[in-house]
């Protein structure tokens, strides 16, 4: 998915539909160009892809972010996702915990 401003891509989301294999949709990556951050675009994009994937009737959506990425944490929470667990030392360079979110339907 792409978030556009005219012909310019200013955000994107990559998802994986695990329905039939593991019965969830995974938010693999979601990014917004630095010039467009702190305007609610991450939540807008996350809400859009979540609503699009509802057509597949997944029991849950999953996603994660770095402990330091407060903006993405707010986007998850704004869209109804709840912190499911914190996984220490999940990311490297720099070493950081992952905040794992889930939205159950």
Residue ranges of model-derived segments:
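Acetyl-CoA-dependent GNAT
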Residues: 1-35, 46-48, 52, 89, ...
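Active-site acidic-Proline motif in GNAT/NAT acetyltransferases
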Residues: 33-35, 39, 67-68
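Residues forming the Rossmann-fold NAD(P)(H) cofactor-binding site
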Residues: 43, 70
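Conserved GNAT acetyl-CoA-binding A-motif
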Residues: 53-65
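Structural motif
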Residues: 56, 78-79
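Conserved catalytic-core motifs of GNAT/GCN5-like acyltransferases
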Residues: 64-65, 80-97
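Short, hydrophobic-biased segments on the C-terminal half of alpha helices
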Residues: 73-74
């Amino acid at each position: 998915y792409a978030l556009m401003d005219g012909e310019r891509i200013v955000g994107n989301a990559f998802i994986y539909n695990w329905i039939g294999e593991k019965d969830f949709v995974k938010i693999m990556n979601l990014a917004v160009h630095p010039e467009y951050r702190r305007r609610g675009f991450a939540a807008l994009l996350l809400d859009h892809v979540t609503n699009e994937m509802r057509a597949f009737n997944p029991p849950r959506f999953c996603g994660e972010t770095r402990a330091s990425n407060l903006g993405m944490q707010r986007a998850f929470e704004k869209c109804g996702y709840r912190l499911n667990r914190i996984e220490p030392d999940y990311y490297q360079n720099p070493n950081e915990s992952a905040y794992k979110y889930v939205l159950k339907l």
